[in-house]
């Protein structure tokens, strides 16, 4: 859903507004509300975040965050899962994880909801890649397909259960097949 303000607002003005439920993103001068996650989306998001954190977090390699606002390059988006390498996780003066993430994730993962535009989600992934993201995934639960995006390369499509999904180099300890990801929907 798009909310058209009576006059255009800046990114800074958008960031001063109260959060909405579901969350809204600021893209190309527009405020766009994300759809409310449904069962398949929520299952994959929870299981994938947990799996990534189980493998990468104990060794302080990286950490996965769900629904985290990332603001960079004149956009403020909320990837379904944002993975940051350990040294890039913003911290406050106490060394705790900061509330504001003014950088792109190292790995951006989006899970397509039935009412969501694949084009808009793909544009967010491409925007991230243009601002330092190493890899983007677009997971389509209805098609049981994962599109993998790398900077300045054509996307790869994974649609066979036995296919291993590529991960960024920092996540080389993580091994996931397409069948594993969509198998979570059967548990």
Predicted regions mapped to residue ranges:
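Gly/Pro/Ser/Thr-rich low-complexity, intrinsically disordered segments predominantly at protein N-termini
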Residues: 1-187
